């Protein structure tokens, strides 16, 4: 029996709808409009597409969008000065620096210059530490989106065995922390994991975030398991460029109970959760009640 397809595009639209409702309430009840500042350094084509999409969706939910486009040769001092100004701007509740940065800029230094309360990407070392110790933090958008989809599909995740394939600071590690927070038994697997297939076969939940096209075949999947595919890989097949995930979709979908497609699965949730994080940051800054269902 084929797996249930978890429609990330439809789920993201629901999240954006909830965010828009809360933004309208903030405007009407408190005269506050959440603001998201996005900083783009250079002219990387993919980054430009992402920034345009983020700006468009920010405005669509009723927030203010502030785009700062800097030349590729912008100095670190000038970039840090901009971040300092945004940190002090009361109309800006979220700050996102689009990655990757040009090679002469220190990404860690730049990210950690952002006020942790405005770090809507959840990459600041303070937010990493807060998440790791189970405290209130800004949570990275992609893992947050994965968690939302898992909760929506399963309800409670308590007691489930979860395997996260990938140990990046952006997805793998925070994903594991979030699953631990929901009382899963979590294994982080990676390129050095022995008998990776056997490890994955024990999982009720598989989150693939390793960046290798179609690495996970269907015979690695426990029957009925839920598969969350974070990977976005471009491959050449039959003379055409295709987007595929980190799991082999066709074979995994024959075994899994539920699966996210690529495209249309995790991807749309990332920007939706960025908007949710900006709303959360705004409510916290103004000491207002946080909206339900948009934070872990």
Swiss-Prot record:
Family annotation (InterPro entries): Aminoacid_DH-like_N_sf, NAD(P)-bd_dom_sf, THF_DH/CycHdrlase, THF_DH/CycHdrlase_cat_dom, THF_DH/CycHdrlase_CS, THF_DH/CycHdrlase_NAD-bd_dom
EC number of the protein: 1.5.1.5, 3.5.4.9
Keyword NADP appears in the UniProt entry: yes
Listed GO CC annotations: cytosol
Any one Pfam family match given in the protein's UniProt record, by short name: THF_DHG_CYH_C
Keyword Oxidoreductase attached: yes
Keyword line: Amino-acid biosynthesis, Histidine biosynthesis, Hydrolase, Methionine biosynthesis, Multifunctional enzyme, NADP, One-carbon metabolism, Oxidoreductase, Purine biosynthesis
UniProt xrefs under CDD domains: NAD_bind_m-THF_DH_Cyclohyd
Pathway where this protein functions: One-carbon metabolism; tetrahydrofolate interconversion
Reaction catalyzed: (6R)-5,10-methylene-5,6,7,8-tetrahydrofolate + NADP(+) = (6R)-5,10-methenyltetrahydrofolate + NADPH; (6R)-5,10-methenyltetrahydrofolate + H2O = (6R)-10-formyltetrahydrofolate + H(+)
GO molecular-function term, one example from the UniProt record: methenyltetrahydrofolate cyclohydrolase activity
One BP term from GO: tetrahydrofolate interconversion
Binding of NADP(+), residues: 166-168, 191, 232
Family, similarity comment: Belongs to the tetrahydrofolate dehydrogenase/cyclohydrolase family.
Main function: Catalyzes the oxidation of 5,10-methylenetetrahydrofolate to 5,10-methenyltetrahydrofolate and then the hydrolysis of 5,10-methenyltetrahydrofolate to 10-formyltetrahydrofolate.
The protein's assembly and partners: Homodimer.
Name by which UniProt lists this protein: Bifunctional protein FolD 1/3
Gene (UniProt): folD1
